[in-house]
């Protein structure tokens, strides 16, 4: 009986380390390491369906949500150095290989919620990505996109043309 218990424990120990799920290998980064000449992006963001804020390198424009006062637009061109630093971050997170950005499987719901819509062009390929925190949790990829957007926002907010835009009035509930 002892022998049977020992064999059972050994088998249990061996099989407990195994899993039916296989770890997916990371998607190979197909982005060129150096920033291509056609690299551009646009991100719209805000609360829920009110994604009035926009940073658009295709059009060299920024739109600021003024809440009760509508929106204001400024012509802002990011420098080559700034575009390189943004591209480097996108390359490091393999943004063109991202897939399930929005899905978390959470049953939670909250209002208001953040939402970002991205359009990115790299080396002739265009990628659209959307995520929100409406269902409370976000994927790790969505979290990376949020950090990237905040990084880009910090760059934009240092620009004189952005500083000259009116302040927002009011708030979202």
Residue ranges and their predicted role:
Residues 14-17:
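C-terminal motif of bacterial Sec signal peptides marking the signal peptidase cleavage site
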């Amino acid at each position: 009986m002892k022998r049977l218990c020992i064999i059972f424990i050994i088998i249990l120990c061996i099989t407990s380390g195994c899993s039916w799920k296989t770890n997916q290998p990371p998607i190979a980064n197909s982005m060129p390491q150096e920033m291509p000449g056609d690299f551009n992006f646009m991100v719209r963001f805000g609360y829920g369906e009110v994604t009035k804020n926009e940073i658009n390198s295709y059009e060299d424009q920024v739109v600021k949500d003024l809440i009760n006062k509508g929106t204001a637009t400024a012509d802002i061109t990011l420098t080559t150095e700034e575009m390189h630093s943004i591209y480097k971050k996108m390359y490091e997170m393999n943004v063109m290989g991202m897939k399930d950005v929005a899905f978390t499987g959470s049953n939670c719901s909250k209002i208001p919620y953040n939402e970002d819509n991205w359009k990115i062009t790299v080396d002739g390929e265009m990628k659209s990505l959307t995520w929100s925190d409406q269902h409370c949790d976000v994927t790790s990829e969505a979290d990376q996109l949020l950090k990237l957007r905040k990084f880009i926002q910090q760059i934009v907010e240092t620009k004189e043309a952005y500083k000259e835009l009116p302040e927002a009035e009011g708030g979202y509930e």
